[in-house]
């Protein structure tokens, strides 16, 4: 996955020429060295990773804005596989582990708690998260709402999304980012395939020797 990440980010830098943002649960030294040349924003999943690479970011020849992924402890995702806030989750830093010294040098906060959901879920997430992380949000330049926003779905409440963005932007004076990955290509085409062969194999019970 790390190798694919670097290829993707290089494509974003060289082909689109716009801002490149990256997040990973962890970075290897080899890949992080490449990311320093490719990315404008780097989000860390833990303070341990941030501390490991902080000096390299500060010594970089180009300006790189870094943030930390938080775990707000609130999500309405029904399938545990896609729920980053289930007990024992390692995705993001929970409130009780936020640290003054460790936060030094970070510009933003990232959270990703949604999966194919409408903006009412985002609104309730903010209701839960903003009061708890208010102290840290006041120190941020940007906030990333993560993905899972089904913006292009016919019943998606865009006006509510706008209110959510303006609420955070105006309260904390930050730039707001979203990552609606699936929504960009939702119902955008068809997958066409041809069946070339059918192979039906009946496997009998193995012979057991006593």
Where are these regions (language model features)?
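Single conserved hydrophobic/aromatic residue that forms the stacking wall/gate
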Residues: 2-3, 7, 201-210
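Short conserved active-site loop signatures built around small residues
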Residues: 68
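FAD-binding glycine-rich core of flavoenzymes that anchor FAD
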Residues: 46-60, 65
